[in-house]
Amino acid sequence: MGIQHMLPSTQTAIIAGPQGEFQLSHDVPVTPLADDEIIMKTAAVALNPVDTKLVGDFITPGAIFGFDCAGVIVAVGPKVGNGLAIGDRVCGSARGMNREKPLGGAFAEYVMLPADLTLRIPPAMTFAEAASLGTALVSACMSLFWTMQIPASLQEPAEKPFPVLVYGGSTATGTMLLQVLKICGVRTLTTCSPKNFDLVRSYGADEVFDYNSPTCAQDIREATRNNLKYAVDCITEDSTIKICYSAIGRAGGQYIALNPYPEHLATRKVIKPGWILATLITGEGSAWPEPYHREPDPEIRALAKPAYSAVQKLLDEGRLRSHPIRVKDGGLAAVLDGVEVLRKGEISGQKLVYCFN
């Protein structure tokens, strides 16, 4: 039998209005507790670029927006077997704008998360820091371990260092990738603007290149002696795929983007391109329009479990930290303003986080 505090029947949440607009509603149902999930009372949420891009056919009117969140567990499903308990401080990535589970988004007073994809927050980490981890962690692990399948893992570091390029190392996913790769014993190369060189080095970058330099790709190729096999593109624009493709060595390799990439620029046959969709981590597939639509794939969820166990250990040991954050108060009402700030491109090098009272 599950354990839970007495939960209200309704809550305040940010949902999609009839025209797909962000709408603050005070009578949104609280999601029923599933057997293998937990419900937390939200303490903080973080914004991601994807939050501003869900429009048109991505929208399900009445569904809750938002992905990254942190809070305190108030309900535990009867089949939760990983020791999570009421009162635990936790974080994760929720099911934002999900057609099949419209009450699953993060921008709400109460959020349900799969227990095996939920992380306990270490005592030294704040709710605000923890709220910023979810999507970046998922994207990093999906890119490296399940799509590229690099010859290293969080549990078994590389026997011999090999280079991996992270294009856009100063992004939230970029700094997470750098940390994860460093733990895996990998030689980390990244691109960013010179003003962020010190930032990416502090997150584990071994070598940093100015993406504005006309010789950026050539410099990376020379630094890796024409042997670079792996590139993760956190930006995914025409110019970024060109640099990544030019930087990968003569023998080819893999290029992974965080968004659908421009296929006409995937010009080298010796390079295997691909892209990831972080929301697939649950194994439940995606009802979003093409090219984002996916059928359920339980294997993804099965692969995620050991990775999450390894990540939990690293968090407990203080070996993973959040991207620089800009913390705002005001709860859900203020999140609406944050979405506009993000949409206008008025924040750089930081992740917007909103704390609840």
From Swiss-Prot:
Example of a GO MF term: nucleotide binding
SUPFAM superfamilies to which the protein is assigned, alphabetical: GroES-like (SSF50129), NAD(P)-binding Rossmann-fold domains (SSF51735)
Pfam families for this protein: ADH_N, ADH_zinc_N
Recorded metabolic or biological pathway in which this protein acts: Mycotoxin biosynthesis
Known function: Trans-enoyl reductase; part of the gene cluster that mediates the biosynthesis of burnettramic acids, an unusual class of bolaamphiphilic pyrrolizidinediones that display potent antibacterial, antifungal, and cytotoxic activities. The first step of the biosynthesis of burnettramic acids is the hydroxylation of proline by the proline hydroxylase buaE to generate 4-hydroxyproline. The PKS-NRPS buaA and trans-enoyl reductase buaC construct the highly reduced polyketide chain, and the condensation (C) domain of buaA then catalyzes the amide bond formation with the activated 4-hydroxyproline.
Binding residues annotated for NADP(+), in chain numbering: 50-53, 170-173, 193-196, 211, 258-259, 347-348
Protein's recorded name: Trans-enoyl reductase buaC
Family under the similarity heading: Belongs to the zinc-containing alcohol dehydrogenase family.
Keywords attached to this entry: Antibiotic biosynthesis, NADP, Nucleotide-binding, Oxidoreductase
EC number: 1.-.-.-
Keyword Cell cycle: no
GO BP annotations, alphabetical order: antibiotic biosynthetic process
Encoding gene per record: buaC
Quaternary structure note: Monomer.
